[in-house]
Amino acid sequence: MKIRKDLCRVEKDGFFGAYFQNPVETDRCIIALLGDDIDDRMAVSGAKWLQGRNCNVMTMAPARKDYGYHSYPLERFEKASAVIRQKGNRKIGIVGGSTTGMLALAAASHYPEITLTIAMTPCDFIIMCTEQSCKP
């Protein structure tokens, strides 16, 4: 089965993501922070699994093949939520694991339109300047 997706770009949409429309009509969407890209095997497998639970899916990442969530602007979730609503979704959730679990918690605490949060093994601190090139 070919999975349909709409790509979103930082320059045009304010965030980097892929919207996976469920073939079955639904008004629920999960923002999925999985792996290091929006359409790699982990992201697509997660999207298919979530679609099987009657959800549309928006996968997000900092950039193509970039696992640099340490400096991910939370404002991108606001932009993604607007696109998700424009596509007819009334309910928005977010899921992430490990570093992205922490990011899911932070995004949901800032944006009340995100009403379901699944944070799998989140860190217990906010990561700042974790790369050697980061200068405080």
Task: Annotate each predicted stretch with a short phrase.
Residues 27-35:
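Short beta-strand element of the alpha/beta-hydrolase
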Residues 47-67:
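Conserved alpha/beta-hydrolase
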Residues 1-28:
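N-terminal cap/lid segment of alpha/beta-hydrolase-fold proteins
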Residues 45-49, 106-107:
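A short acidic, amphipathic alpha-helical/loop segment
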Residues 31, 58, 116-118:
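Hydrophobic/aromatic beta-strand patches that form the interior of the parallel beta-sheet core
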Residues 61-93:
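Catalytic nucleophile-loop/oxyanion-hole region of alpha/beta-hydrolase
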Residues 39, 82-136:
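Primarily recognizes the serine-hydrolase "nucleophile elbow" in alpha/beta-hydrolase
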Residues 42:
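N-terminal carbohydrate-binding/catalytic regions of secreted carbohydrate-active enzymes
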